[in-house]
Amino acid sequence: MSASALVCLAPGSEETEAVTTIDLLVRGGIKVTTASVASDGNLAITCSRGVKLLADAPLVEVADGEYDVIVLPGGIKGAECFRDSTLLVETVKQFHRSGRIVAAICAAPATVLVPHDIFPIGNMTGFPTLKDKIPAEQWLDKRVVWDARVKLLTSQGPGTAIDFGLKIIDLLVGREKAHEVASQLVMAAGIYNYYE
């Protein structure tokens, strides 16, 4: 059975983080389902910079699926929409309780995970200007933070979306596949390519 990911989208989600992650996961052979968390259930999502994305389904229709990871892109307005969605918060909690991976980038860790106390323990990172919203004992100033104790993956922002997507591939499919995908990209220096 192949790995699968549920990528949540909301009005104001950060498009670079969403699209980069989706693209890399597909390249890694991971089945991706995109879910709209828009309060009106609209599948057409206008992202933070005006780019329009079309979700596969409203979250209510796919939340109970057997996905291996739930992905929360950032973008402050999108993250606030996630934070205010009872269904989204409960879905994230269910992933955590069932031992599946929760992956959040940019504004999502500080705006969604922390206020709902979903990970009272667990190291994390996020958008640097939101550092004060994450407990000091949990904050790590790194491009990507994987805390295997609680199966939490976090990352900092649009410029770390490739690192984030590759780490999800590594976790779900393996290091070899992450390296294969990385080798197809012309990556900036400093991004780990899974080759060592």
Swiss-Prot record:
Biological process according to GO: cellular response to oxidative stress; DNA repair; protein refolding; protein repair; response to heat; ribosome biogenesis
Modification(s) after translation: Cys-106 is easily oxidized to sulfinic acid.
SUPFAM superfamilies linked: Class I glutamine amidotransferase-like (SSF52317)
InterPro entries xrefs: Class_I_gatase-like (IPR029062), DJ-1 (IPR006287), DJ-1/PfpI (IPR002818), Prot/Nucl_acid_deglycase (IPR050325)
Activity regulation, per record: Glyoxalase activity is inhibited by zinc ions. Active as a chaperone in both its reduced and oxidized states, and is more active in its oxidized form.
Keywords: Chaperone, DNA damage, DNA repair, Hydrolase, Oxidation, Stress response
Matching Gene3D superfamilies: 3.40.50.880
Active-site residues annotated for this sequence: C106
Effect of C106D: Does not complement a disruption mutant
Disruption phenotype: Cells lacking this gene display highest sensitivity to carbonyl stress. The yajL mutant (but not the parental strain) suffers from a 100-fold decrease in viability after incubation for 48 hours in LB medium containing 0.6% glucose, and the mutant is rescued by YajL- and DJ-1-overproducing plasmids. The wild-type strain displays a small quantity of glycated proteins after overnight culture in LB medium supplemented with 0.6% glucose, whereas the yajL mutant displays much higher levels of glycated proteins, and also higher DNA and RNA glycation levels.
Entry annotated with the keyword Acetylation: no
A cellular component annotation (GO) from this entry: cytoplasm
Residue(s) carrying Cysteine sulfinic acid (-SO2H): C106
GO MF annotation, one: protein homodimerization activity
Enzyme Commission number(s) from the entry: 3.1.2.-, 3.5.1.-, 3.5.1.124
UniProt catalytic activity: N(omega)-(1-hydroxy-2-oxopropyl)-L-arginyl-[protein] + H2O = lactate + L-arginyl-[protein] + H(+); N(6)-(1-hydroxy-2-oxopropyl)-L-lysyl-[protein] + H2O = lactate + L-lysyl-[protein] + H(+); S-(1-hydroxy-2-oxopropyl)-L-cysteinyl-[protein] + H2O = lactate + L-cysteinyl-[protein] + H(+); N(omega)-(1-hydroxy-2-oxoethyl)-L-arginyl-[protein] + H2O = L-arginyl-[protein] + glycolate + H(+)
Function: Protein and nucleotide deglycase that catalyzes the deglycation of the Maillard adducts formed between amino groups of proteins or nucleotides and reactive carbonyl groups of glyoxals. Thus, functions as a protein deglycase that repairs methylglyoxal- and glyoxal-glycated proteins, and releases repaired proteins and lactate or glycolate, respectively. Deglycates cysteine, arginine and lysine residues in proteins, and thus reactivates these proteins by reversing glycation by glyoxals.
Family: Belongs to the peptidase C56 family.
Subunit composition and interactions: Homodimer.
Protein name: Protein/nucleic acid deglycase 3
Highest classification ranks of the organism: Bacteria, Pseudomonadati, Pseudomonadota, Gammaproteobacteria, Enterobacterales
